Amino acid sequence: MNDVDASIEPKRIKEVRAYVVKGGGADYHDQSSEHWILGYIATPISIYPEYRASRASWGLNVLGSVVVEVESSDGEVGFGISTGGYPAAWIIENHLSRFVVGKYVGEVEKTWDQMFKATIYYGRRGIVMNAISAVDLALWDLMGKVRGLPVYDLLGGPVRDELTFYATGPRPDVAKSLGFIGGKLPLIHGPADGIEGLRENVRIFKEAREKVGDDFLLMYDCWMSLDLPYAQRLLSELKPYGLFWIEEPFIPDDYWSFGALANIAPPTLVASGEHESTVHGFRLLLELGKVNVIQPDVTWVGGVTPMIKIAALAEAYGAWVIPHGSSVYGYHFIITRVNSPFAEYLVVSPDATKIVPQFHPLLRDEPIPQNGKVRLSRKPGFGVELNRDLLVRPFKST
C-alpha cells in the first residue's frame, strides 16, 4: 500500500485576479486594420453596405483579452485566458470570484456548476461564458501544476502521440506547402452580394482546389452569414470541387436550417458550434441540426469542464469534436479524445503565409505546428507561461 498522510489538507485557492490585455492575445481579432481576419469577409451584418468592407467597422475587435490568475494557499498560480476585456474582468472580480476563493484545488466541477447557475439570469452565452471559461482554464492549469501533470493527463491521457492540423486562412496553397492536411477558406461574399458574389465564392474555391489538388481537405467557413436558400445553392455549386465541410452557415440558434442543409449535404459534412454554449445547446445542434462536426471553442464555451460532457454527447451521436481555435487549451483536450481526429490552427500572421503563435504575445512557449503537427510537452498544467508585462488589473474583488 502507498503511504498517504490523510491529515494533510488539500490546498485551497486564496485569490482570483482578472486582467485585460490589448493587441492580440486571447482576442485574436484585435489586430491592425491590414490583417486578413478583419478584411472583406461575409458576416451576419454585412447585409448592410456600411459594414461590409471590414469586420473592424462594426466592432469585431473591440473587446480585447481577459486573463485570470488563481493562486493557491502556498503561492502556486494557474492562469486562463479568453475574449472579454473589461466587461469580463468586472464579472470575474465582482461575481465569479466568490465561487472560487476558499475552494480546494481540484473542485472544478462544483465551482463550474456554481458559476454557471449563479449567472443564468444574465448569462448562459457570450461574454459571461467567456469569463467562466477563463476561470475554469485557470483552475485546470493550477490543478496540473499542483499535481505536476499536464492537463491532458488529468483528462485521461493522450490517445495519440501527436496532433495533426488543418489551417484556417485565405492561403490554403501555403498551408499545404507547410505540411497541413487541409485548409479552411473564409467565405468572402454573403447573400447581399447576390448571384455575382455567389459565383465569386465558387471561383475562389475552384481556384484553391486547382492549386492544392484533390488529396487536400478544403472547407468553407461561412461565419453565420447565410440563409438557407443561399446555402443550398452554394453547396450545390461547390460539390464538383470536393468541399469537405461547410462551416457555420447559419446563426447558432437556427437549428432547423442546419437540419435542412444536412439532409442534402452528403458527402459534404456540416460543421458548427464555435458560437454555441452548454451541453443543451450542443444537444439541439446534434439532434435538430444534424451536424457531423461540432466545434466548441474551449476558451468561449466555459472551459475544459463542460467540454468533457459535450464531447461525450457528440460521441453518442457519432459526431467529431474539432474545437475552434483555442490553441494549447484545445490541444490538451483534443489529444485525449478518440472522436477528435485532428485540430485547427488559425493562421494569425497578417498575410496568412507564416506560422506564428495564435495567442502571441500573451503566451510564452506556445506550441505551433511544425510540418502540420504538434507534439505536446510534459510540462505541468497547459505547459505555457504568461507574459505578465502586458497585464492590467482594472478591478479588484469587493
Curated annotation (Swiss-Prot):
EC number: 4.2.1.90
Chain positions recorded as Mg(2+) binding sites: D221, E247, E274
Cofactor: Mg(2+)
Source superkingdom: Archaea
Keywords associated with the record: Lyase, Magnesium, Metal-binding
Ranges in a coiled coil: none
Cofactor annotation remark: Binds 1 Mg(2+) ion per subunit.
Annotated positions binding substrate: H29, R55, E344
UniProt site positions, description: Increases basicity of active site His: D297
UniProt-listed InterPro entries: Enolase-like_C_sf, Enolase-like_N, Enolase_C-like, L-Rhamnon_dehydrat, Mandel_Rmase/mucon_lact_enz_CS, Mandelate_racemase_C, Mandelate_racemase_N_dom, RHMD-like
Catalytic residue list: H324 (proton acceptor)
A Pfam family assignment: MR_MLE_N
Reaction catalyzed: L-rhamnonate = 2-dehydro-3-deoxy-L-rhamnonate + H2O
Enzyme class name: lyase
Sites annotated Transition state stabilizer: E344
GO biological process, one term: amino acid catabolic process
Molecular function in Gene Ontology: L-rhamnonate dehydratase activity; magnesium ion binding
Role description: Catalyzes the dehydration of L-rhamnonate to 2-keto-3-deoxy-L-rhamnonate (KDR).
Further details from the record: Reaction proceeds via a syn dehydration.
Family (UniProt): Belongs to the mandelate racemase/muconate lactonizing enzyme family. RhamD subfamily.
Name the record gives this protein: Putative L-rhamnonate dehydratase
Source organism of this protein record: Caldivirga maquilingensis (strain ATCC 700844 / DSM 13496 / JCM 10307 / IC-167)
Gene: rhmD
